């Protein structure tokens, strides 16, 4: 499966401001988002399932891949394109056994060692970060910056996206590293005009 990682949106209901998630995701896709990850940490399994199912209706319509954060059971239940796992989540090899070879598995990494391990274990792509300070992740151990991103990117051969504090003022510097895409939350979801916010993060608009 050929995946376009150029503009990777991660959901977060805290930024909805009363708006419908389906509408927000649709506007983001119309603005240029190429892949969507459903990431909702503080909800019940049933609620997460309902949220993911709702988002998948939109991503299916626009033929955009949908990734589920951490929850393999939800990914299987809605037949998502794949999952994204952190360093403390289920091991990649076990996730691959459960999901099979045709599903996408992404791994969060913050240094070269983690990146090479994930690549060697068969990750389809990496989420590299945290690049810049951000308010949406509370357990950030280290900000790696553009230099750290470049070192990791240069050490691997699989696709990767950068994450952490990326916005319309700095995304071009991030893309200069040769990374396949940028992953954002508030840079799109915290804006009033979702479609425009997404479009402002495209290098070739």
Curated annotation (Swiss-Prot):
Residues that, per the record, bind 4-amino-2-methyl-5-(diphosphooxymethyl)pyrimidine: 37-41, 69, 108, 137
Enzyme class: transferase
Keyword Repressor assigned: no
Residues engaged in binding 2-[(2R,5Z)-2-carboxy-4-methylthiazol-5(2H)-ylidene]ethyl phosphate: 134-136, 165, 185-186
Cofactor note: Binds 1 Mg(2+) ion per subunit.
Name of the molecule in the record: Thiamine-phosphate synthase
Keywords annotated in UniProt: Magnesium, Metal-binding, Thiamine biosynthesis, Transferase
The EC number(s) this enzyme carries: 2.5.1.3
The family this protein is said to belong to: Belongs to the thiamine-phosphate synthase family.
Essential cofactor(s): Mg(2+)
InterPro entries in the record: Aldolase_TIM, ThiamineP_synth_sf, ThiamineP_synth_TenI, TMP_synthase
